[in-house]
Amino acid sequence: MDIVSLGWAFLMVVFSFSLSLVVWGRNGL
C-alpha cells in the first residue's frame, strides 16, 4: 500500500465524516 492510496483513503474518510456531521447538524441530531 503506497502513500497515495493511503492519502486518498484518509481523504474519503474525512469527507464522509464531515458530510455526515453536516447532515446530522441539519436534522438537529
Curated annotation (Swiss-Prot):
It comes from the Eukaryota. It comes from Chlorokybus atmophyticus (Soil alga). InterPro entries: Cytochr_b6-f_cplx_su8_sf, Cytochrome_b6-f_cplx_su8. HAMAP family: Cytb6_f_PetN (MF_00395). This is Cytochrome b6-f complex subunit 8. Belongs to the PetN family. The chain crosses the membrane at residues 3-23. GO terms for biological process: cytochrome complex assembly; photosynthesis. GO terms for molecular function: electron transporter, transferring electrons within cytochrome b6/f complex of photosystem II activity. It is found in: Plastid, Chloroplast thylakoid membrane. The keyword tRNA-binding does not apply. It is a single-pass membrane protein. The gene is petN. Component of the cytochrome b6-f complex, which mediates electron transfer between photosystem II (PSII) and photosystem I (PSI), cyclic electron flow around PSI, and state transitions. GO terms for cellular component: chloroplast thylakoid membrane; cytochrome b6f complex. The 4 large subunits of the cytochrome b6-f complex are cytochrome b6, subunit IV (17 kDa polypeptide, PetD), cytochrome f and the Rieske protein, while the 4 small subunits are PetG, PetL, PetM and PetN. The complex functions as a dimer. Pfam families: PetN. SUPFAM superfamilies: PetN subunit of the cytochrome b6f complex (SSF103451). Keywords: Chloroplast, Electron transport, Membrane, Photosynthesis, Plastid, Thylakoid, Transmembrane, Transmembrane helix, Transport. Its main location: plastid.
